[in-house]
Amino acid sequence: LGALTQLLLNLGKL
């Protein structure tokens, strides 16, 4: 667990 959270954070940063 972690990759999904990172992906979500990246999407939010966009």
From Swiss-Prot:
Where, per the database record, does this protein carry Leucine amide? Answer: 14
| GO CC annotation | extracellular region
Source organism superkingdom? Eukaryota
| Locations listed in the record | Secreted
Disulphide connectivity of cysteines: none
Entry keyword set: Amidation, Amphibian defense peptide, Antibiotic, Antimicrobial, Secreted
What's an example GO BP annotation here?
defense response to bacterium
Q: In which tissues is it expressed?
A: Expressed by the skin glands.
Give the function comment from the record. Answer: Antimicrobial peptide.
Q: Member of which family?
A: Belongs to the frog skin active peptide (FSAP) family. Temporin subfamily.
Q: What is this protein called?
A: Temporin-1LTa
- Provide the species name: Rana latastei (Italian agile frog)
